Each structure stands twice: as C-alpha cells, then as structure tokens.
Amino acid sequence: MFDIRPYLVIPKLIIQPTWGGNYIAQVKGWDRGELATNKIGQSYELCSGSNLSLITSSKNPQFLAEITNSKAVELPTSPPNSIPLVRLIETDPNSVLGNEIVTQFGPTMPLLIKFTQALGNSFQLHVPDGTKHPKWKPKPESWYYFEPGMVTLGVKSGVNWEEYQKSVTELDEYICALSQQVLSGSKTLADAKNEINKLIVKYNPRQFVNFAYPNAGDLIDLSPCGIHHSWEEDTDKYPLGNVLYELQVNVMDDVATIRSFDKGKMNKDGSVRPLQIEDYFAFIDRSPKANNPKTHFQKSQHITEKLSYSKERLMKTKYYALDKVVITGYKSAYHERIDRFKHVFIKSGEIEVTAGNVSITVSKGHSVFIPKMALEYSIKNNSKDSVILISY
C-alpha cells in the first residue's frame, strides 16, 4: 500500500508549434530553457496516464514536466521520484477513486483535465451521450475560460442543412484532390495552400454556424454532446487564442472527434487529415436548444461565503463537477471531507495542501491529486489571495 497523502501531478506538456503559445509555461513558472523556445498547446493536468510526484513542492527544481506529443501522451512513462496513477489505482480502486466512481466508470481514471492555449481547430462534435456505435464514443467536455476567446457554437437557426453539408463535402473533395497533386509532385505546397484559401472563401463554411465570444470566467458545458463546436482565431482581437481549462471524460480523439471542416490545413508533405462529414451530419443534434449558444453558457452556483474563503460550483454534470474556491488572506485555511478523489489546480496564488501526515507546497499553475482514502484534506494559503479549481 502507498502512504495516505496528496501528490503533485506531473503535467504532460504538448508542444504545438502552429497553434500553441507561451501562456502555460509562464503561468507554471517554467518559461525558461526548452519551454521558453517551444510553443505549448496543452498541459495534461490529469489523465489515465498521469504520473504522481513524490516531491513535496512544485517550486523544487527537480519537479519537472514531461514533454510529449498528443499521440504519446497516454503511454506509460517513468519520471524520477514518481509513481504512475494507474499503479496507485490498481492497489485499491475504491480507496483511490471512490466507490461511486468505480461503480459508474470501472477501476480507471475517468477524468481528463487539460490546461489549453489554442488558436483555431476543426469544426467538430462528439456523438450524443448514450450513443452505442462500433467506432464512435461520446466525449462529454466542458470549458472554463481563463482569458477572452472566440468560438463557434451550434449551427445557425433556419440553416439549410443540405446546403451546409454540400458546402463542406465539395470543399473537402477539392482539398483532397489538391493534396494528391502535392503528394505526387505535380503541384507545389504553396500553390495548393493558395487555392485552398480561395476555396474556403468560396464555400465559406463559417456562414452556417454561430460565433460566440466567451469572457474570462465563462464556462461552456458541452457534456450532452452532439453539439457543433470549434475554437476560432483572430490574432488582433484575441492574441492569446483560446486559453481555457478543460474537463472531459477520458476518451481519446481518434474514437471521439468527428470533423466536418479542418480549416484547410495541409501538412508539409501535402497530406491532409481525413474528415467524417457524413457522420458529423448523422450525429449532430439539430434541435433549436442545442444550437443556441446561450444554452451552453453555465451560471455558477454560490455555495459558501466566509471571511477567509468563498466557494462556488461552476458546474456539475453526471460525469464530473468543478468548484472554485477563493481563499483570502495569508495563512487562511480551507478544509473539506471527501468520499471520492479530488483534483486541485492552483489558478493563482500559492497554497499548502495537507492530507494524511504529508503537506505539499503548490504554486500557481500546478495541481494536486488527493485520493479518496485521505477522507479529508486542508489547504493553507501561502499568499495574499489564491484561486483554486477543484475537480471531481
């Protein structure tokens, strides 16, 4: 058995030279060396492949991130001074995750938490909750915005669905033909990209969808799935792109993400990513409610207000929940009893987390895993004010 204690989560950082940035490394205090010269698109704060550090302070120079890519992020690794989360769970799933979690999801980590900085991504959706399909699995997800951003959310009211499908289908056919020409050497990459840009203007897939502009502190809940969404980019108005904290059910993209428009992206060799346009239109929720962006912006619920801290529930779905705690005043405390695991992310400030007989220091941008067997944990504020996100 392992000690009853909190664990620093070793973040897995995904380098994304085309759509990442330096926000994540700066927040974590790691904007130096390799991380100062590479753009980071995502930090996996919790996943089934997470490793838990035995180090007791995120400010310890030996506490380092894992640098990886989106294809390898779930593969087993063995950083120094750590234990794999999966190994901890295997010792006693109920004691680590909680009885209700194991009953609902089985003896595995069901939650995927990502700290993201991203420019535009594809038009996409996930099959509706409860769908049984030989390939596709639902992927409930929710976004909590740290900075103002730009998205598409739902399809416009009164849209001609056949025209929308025809538009993205023909556009994809032309782009695939250009891809073959580049791959065969009969057309240059530059010429193909120039033609793609003209085709996007002609077919204009964005004319069919709603734009929305989340502010810092907004939460968008897409957990019912079947909802069109994408991140968009305007580097003049939103130079940081979309900076957000994502909660998802731990399902990988290759069995969950159905795309209809990939923004005309073409790799250096001329290849393009396959789209799933027929499935996109087969599984999209066409109801007015699902396609109204206002449906998905969630209002928080006030829980507690005390002199030393305040607590609000940002959201609660049948898969996961997210609370925000603001601790005010140096050495102010927060205490909680638990019947399931908790994940604590420090959005700002610095805290000391104690569970069992172990205390760890957690600075801004870092996170802690607290197993259910701790039964309770306490937080002492090490700064003037700290903002904490608690997921479970």
Predicted regions and their residues:
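Transition-metal
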Residues: 1-187, 252-253, 262-297, 322-324
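His/acidic/aromatic-lined binding-pocket segments of jelly-roll/cupin-type domains
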Residues: 112-114, 121, 134-136, 141-144, ...
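Ligand-binding loop in jelly-roll beta-barrel domains
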Residues: 116-120, 128, 137-138, 147-150, ...
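Short beta-strand segments in beta-sandwich/barrel cores
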Residues: 151, 332-333, 342, 349-354
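Short, basic/aromatic beta-hairpin or loop at an interaction surface
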Residues: 186-202, 338-347
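Loop-centered beta-sheet repeat module
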Residues: 193-257
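Short acidic-glycine-tyrosine-enriched beta hairpin
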Residues: 209-221, 356-374
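Functionally critical, mid-to-C-terminal surface segments that flank or help form catalytic/ligand
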Residues: 277-339
